[in-house]
Amino acid sequence: MAENLVNTFVTQVIENSDYEELDRIYLTNKVFTLVGEGVADVETDSSELIDLKDQLLQAGVKAGSVGELNEEQDIIGAQLMDLITPRPSVVNRNFWDTYKSNPEQAIADFYAQSKRNDYVKVKAIAQNIAYKAPTKYGDLEITINLSKPEKDPKAIAAAKNAVASDYPKCQLCMENEGYLGRINHPARSNHRVVRFQMEDKEWGFQYSPYAYFNEHSIFFYGKHEPMHISPLTFGRLLTIVEAFPGYFAGSNADLPIVGGSILTHEHYQGGRHTFPMEVAGIKEKVSFDGYSDVEAGIVNWPMSVLRLRSEDKERLIALATKILNCWRGYSDEKAGVLAESDGQPHHTITPIARRKDGKFELDLVLRDNQTSEEYPDGIYHPHKDVQHIKKENIGLIEVMGLAILPPRLKTELKDVEDYLLGQGNQVAPIHQEWADELKAQNPNITAEEVTEVVRQSVADIFARVLEDAGVYKTNNEGLDQFKAFVDFVNLAD
């Protein structure tokens, strides 16, 4: 039975917050302030808080009191959901009070709140296309990212005309907590951050609004300082996996081409997810002089990964530091490895930490950001022939075996399927050669098979993308060159 939309929303706010029935008129006026009184008579059949919020926004747009741009609606939507979101002081007090007796419950409660108040965009994330496919490196995870709305041309124009502001300095700064937002900066009224101390400095723990995996978290430094891989990085990642049970923690590299999209603010990512790289076996065990207590090996993975395991955090940090320092200064002309040119460093590491079976684990992924005439985008970057699927930087998440592919592929891959079935003769020019190859390989393909064939091919191409990003190739020659670097580490003081 249809009920009044505003009244139903207010009822849900009261049920999901510390507001009381006596606050109903006050809350109703808060809603009218945000979406306009023109929605007063709109009815609804829904009782889900986020659905009700969306309906209020749609009603406001129809009434002319809410802007048509997604960014304008997000600003108002976040304010509506802020009504059920406790103050930062309350969020932090609740988290740490619960943490004393049950860390897992504290984390679970904060995650539940972040979903309930629509900070983690559960409905939007559900639109993503996601699947696993077997490759020679095990099952890889493929996602076509449809959760983030693409920029409307009107929004792009509005952003260009917006008054310039450097507050907050970036999207990771602590000052985003409760920030209203603007056309060119996301709405954060319902954003909350759990503070914690690391090395006697303030850090923040939050969830990613457009999560790429389960409980996708961000751990960021309280000050706006650039990312830097150092011995401190290894210690911090291990501290995080100790403090947040069941979570991994990793860092993007700190150099262009091989780094992530935000290099201006020190931060790490984590979450409760088992990535393909984690379950990849050891291709060859290695040993490091003076570290017989640390298990070490080269991982059977398309990228160049050393895995270290020990019960002793400090021993892992010491060895990882030695490997990092050696890699930063290591060159091997035959292997195409160059530490620096014209004073510009080329080498860094993408580190990932876990705690498993009572031991700490560090994966150190060797990165090299050289470019050349043949590979202007990066020698160890997706090469031209696979850029029709993935041309962006290979960051932390992809390194671990989860492809984040652009929204354009949803329709482009459907066109490729139709082309293979003979139901269309038009594919995007960048896919033409690939589509022709698939057609030649599958001349009698059926409608029941076509999606699986295309999806499998995308996964195989992603495996190639990771091979391109790998410094040492996965053949015997590459393994020998990798072991030569291990020998170099052992010869270092």
From Swiss-Prot:
Example GO molecular function: UDP-glucose:hexose-1-phosphate uridylyltransferase activity
According to UniProt, this protein's pathway is: Carbohydrate metabolism; galactose metabolism
Q: If you read the UniProt record, what top EC class would you report for this enzyme, in one word?
A: transferase
The cysteines joined by S-S bonds are none
Q: What UniProt keywords are attached to this protein's entry?
A: Carbohydrate metabolism, Cytoplasm, Galactose metabolism, Nucleotidyltransferase, Transferase
Pfam family name, one = GalP_UDP_tr_C
The reaction(s) this protein catalyses: alpha-D-galactose 1-phosphate + UDP-alpha-D-glucose = alpha-D-glucose 1-phosphate + UDP-alpha-D-galactose
Picking any one GO biological process from the record gives: galactose metabolic process
Where in or outside the cell it occurs: the entry states: Cytoplasm
Q: Which GO terms describe its cellular component?
A: cytoplasm
Query: Domain of life, per the record?
Result: Bacteria
Protein name (record) = Galactose-1-phosphate uridylyltransferase
Q: Which gene encodes it?
A: galT
